[in-house]
């Protein structure tokens, strides 16, 4: 960011600037790979160029975004990445407040290499995996795992999708395994439902976390294409006017906090 002094001055800089970065890649690195750029945070308006071509525009400094650069990178010459950033907006008062509009790239930027078949990286720059708990009790938890798989190859792909719930020791306590077919340059949305018997419930006093592991392998299950892990706390809650907030059936007094993210998520 160009606002390193924003905590100590009221009239910090609200303007636009350019970032430039040169990088190299070669044909061997790109073979059977997809290449992505992920920006964790750029404030407030970002235009991303690669080798002089505008790839994407992103509005908002508090959300990450990802762009596929596979077809734009050069393997025979240096690549020039340029990002034009503007944190000025004359229509939004005040200039200063109880939070800081840090200008520029103020979080990490990642260059990600993925197999041709992988878990989607462009779904709002998330992990591509969403875990929900349709029903939870002390006896049983139903776990929904959703996501999108993509195939950027010119041929249809037949793959193995393995969804596991792991305990804190890494032991598999619930699992779903099946074959999926993805058309050439296509996508496949999935949802797997798993049952967890006698779950260890999460609470502030006992913050037990499971881990949901989603693996994508070749049709024989030998070659790992992609893998993502998502932490999972199994719990249920309710709110009503008479009894207030309850966690896992027990009353819990909530003490809130107000903290602006400013620099880090």
Feature locations, PLM:
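Conserved, mostly hydrophobic/aromatic
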Residues: 52, 109, 147, 210, ...
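N-terminal carbohydrate-binding accessory modules
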Residues: 129, 213-265
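Short, solvent-exposed loop/linker segments at the N-terminal edge
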Residues: 133-141
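Accessory beta-strand-rich segments of carbohydrate-active enzymes
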Residues: 9-122, 126-128, 152-153, 168
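Short glycine/proline/serine/threonine-rich loop/turn segments at secondary-structure transition edges
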Residues: 30-33, 73-78, 156, 196-211
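Short strand-edge motifs at loop-to-beta-strand transitions and within beta-strands
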Residues: 19-21, 63-67, 178, 186-194
């Amino acid at each position: 960011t160009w606002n390193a002094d924003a905590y100590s001055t009221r009239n910090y800089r609200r303007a636009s600037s350019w970032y430039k970065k040169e990088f190299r890649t070669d044909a061997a690195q790109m073979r059977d790979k997809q290449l992505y750029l992920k920006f964790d945070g750029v404030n407030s308006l970002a235009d991303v160029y690669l080798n002089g071509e505008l790839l994407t525009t992103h509005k908002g400094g508090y959300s990450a975004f990802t762009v596929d650069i596979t077809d734009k990178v050069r393997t025979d010459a240096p690549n020039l990445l340029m990002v034009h950033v503007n944190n000025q907006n004359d229509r939004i008062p005040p200039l200063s407040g109880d939070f800081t509009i840090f200008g520029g790239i103020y979080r990490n930027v990642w260059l990600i290499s993925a197999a041709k078949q992988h878990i989607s990286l462009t779904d709002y720059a998330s992990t591509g995996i969403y875990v929900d708990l349709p029903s939870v009790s002390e006896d049983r938890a139903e776990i929904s795992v959703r996501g999108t798989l993509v195939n950027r190859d010119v041929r249809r792909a037949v793959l193995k999708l393995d969804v596991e719930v792991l305990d804190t020791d890494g032991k598999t306590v619930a699992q779903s395994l099946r074959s999926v077919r993805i058309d050439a340059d296509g996508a496949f949305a999935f949802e797997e439902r798993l049952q967890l018997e006698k779950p260890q419930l999460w609470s502030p006093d006992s913050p037990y976390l499971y881990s949901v592991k989603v693996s994508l392998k070749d049709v024989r299950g030998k070659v790992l294409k992609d893998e993502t892990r998502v932490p999972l706390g199994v719990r249920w809650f309710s709110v009503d006017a008479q009894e207030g907030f309850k966690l896992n059936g027990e009353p819990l007094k909530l003490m809130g906090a107000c903290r602006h993210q400013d620099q880090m998520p």
